[in-house]
A protein has these predicted regions:
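Preference for protein termini
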Residues: 1-252
């Protein structure tokens, strides 16, 4: 797609951003991923992930081209999330739902959960909410991907986000989860996290488990990747491979 056509499309955005996004998605097939930058982002840590192995075993994990979303659809998604949050906080709604749930559902962990996500799919009629995911994956993989984005032309460059994901904010979310849990969290800092999934090495997003392990370790938090069968509770503490676990990052 030439720059002149892209300029005409960007001029459409204020008046009809949905039509402009649709035209861009159908007409702009430029490759926007700088694979050298993506390789550097994935392989910078100890126990590095191989960019080549990742592409060989998971060829569709990263898309080479951008997806354009209209401002109107983003606003609609934000309003949907806000409405759901308001309804979920209503005492009458909570009692109605909990009446049909097992007793354990009444336990409040003190926080909504790290990476609680609302999963929207975009269709001809706009965004549709298909899932509320209490442990959505992909944050670190997307952070690596976003850093590797290169605009194919000036109009697209103006559409790209100015702020990049901050891994420090991700770590802060886990520390806040620990603080809200109460008990020992008031007396000592978060010391060890277990990243848990069934047969974790076989999971499609296993590379992200390793990225999170590296991130935690780099920020002074011991971390391990484990199957739930490796965890045990002695009445006082949660243990994995002989080590006390403070917090479970549940990826089940």
């Amino acid at each position: 797609m030439d720059n002149e056509r892209l300029r005409s499309l960007t001029d459409l955005l204020p008046a009809d951003c949905r039509a402009a996004a649709d035209l861009l998605n159908r007409g702009c097939a430029c490759i926007s991923v700088d694979h050298q930058s993506l390789k550097a982002a994935l392989e910078h840590g100890e126990g590095a992930i191989s960019h080549a192995d990742l592409l060989a075993t998971r060829p569709h994990l990263f898309a080479d081209s951008m997806v354009f979303v209209s401002e109107a659809h983003l606003l609609r998604m934000a309003k949907t999330v806000a409405a759901l949050e308001r309804v979920a906080a209503l005492p009458a709604y909570r009692e109605r739902v909990l009446a049909h749930a097992p007793p354990v559902a009444r336990h409040s962990p003190g926080a909504a959960g790290v990476f609680l996500g609302y999963d929207f799919h975009l269709g001809p009629d706009g965004p549709w909410l298909i899932e509320i995911n209490s442990n959505a994956g992909g944050a670190l993989l997307n952070a690596c991907l976003l850093r590797a984005q290169r605009a194919c032309c000036e109009p697209v460059a103006r559409m790209m986000p100015a702020a990049l994901p901050d891994e420090a904010a991700f770590v802060a979310m886990f520390r806040e989860e620990w603080r809200l849990a109460g008990r020992d969290s008031r007396l000592r800092p978060l010391a060890r996290i277990a990243i848990v999934d069934s047969l974790p090495a076989e999971q499609y997003l296993a590379p992200e488990f390793e990225l999170f392990r590296q991130l935690f370790e780099a920020n002074g938090i011991a971390a391990m990747i484990a199957d739930p069968a490796e965890l045990s509770f002695d009445g006082e503490r949660l243990v994995c491979r002989g080590q006390t676990v403070d917090l479970v990052y549940n990826r089940l």
